[in-house]
Regions:
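Short, Lys/Arg-rich flexible segments
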Residues: 1-89, 112-115, 119-173
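Extended Gly/Ser/Thr-rich low-complexity repeat segments
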Residues: 90-106
Length: 173
């Protein structure tokens, strides 16, 4: 962008107005790009979460079943945050249990170590199967759940698409 002006009050004022208009276009582009990337990230993370399997409950016959779960992804703070909501979000993202996720410090999720994910309770991960009591007072046996990583996988995918998304947003202005 080139702006030519003379050293006169009116010419300088016109140049300043041109710059202010350009600044508004840049701010709109930044906001539109941020929102578009955030919405695509949320949409793809939701698709991955919807196809995830959660839990591995073992029934009395030894059959393994997946549990129902809630994993809702939304955009917040004017596109500055993509948030996953639900009671099972951490388990779906990072996994639970030594059976699927290995010994302490060997989580399949690349960011787990930074968040102290992958440590185990009193038994230190010695048991591949454990039980908990459900809302009906019944013991449920489980191996835990493998790290599905919908947020992390979506981030990797969308990050590679940012140049193309930026071009699409710029062309739409």
């Amino acid at each position: 962008m080139n702006i030519r002006f003379e050293l006169s009050k009116d010419s300088i004022k016109a140049a300043v107005n041109t710059l202010k208009a350009y600044q508004k276009r840049v701010e709109k582009y930044e906001r539109d790009l941020r929102l578009e990337v955030a919405h695509r990230l949320a949409e793809y993370a939701q698709q991955l979460a919807d196809s995830a399997e959660y839990g591995s409950v073992i029934d009395d016959e030894g059959n393994v079943h997946s549990l129902p779960f809630t994993f809702d992804v939304s955009v917040a703070n004017d596109g500055r945050l993509v948030v996953a909501h639900g009671d099972e979000v951490a388990f779906i993202e990072f996994g639970a249990g030594v059976y699927y996720n290995g010994a302490v410090g060997t989580s399949p999720h690349p960011k787990a170590g930074n968040l102290t994910i992958g440590s185990y309770g009193k038994g230190k991960g010695a048991q591949e199967t454990w039980a908990y009591m459900d809302e009906n007072g019944e013991f449920v046996y489980t191996h835990g759940t493998i790290a599905q990583m919908p947020m992390y996988k979506a981030l990797l995918s969308i990050a590679q698409q940012v140049p193309r998304i930026a071009k699409e947003v710029a062309e739409s202005l």
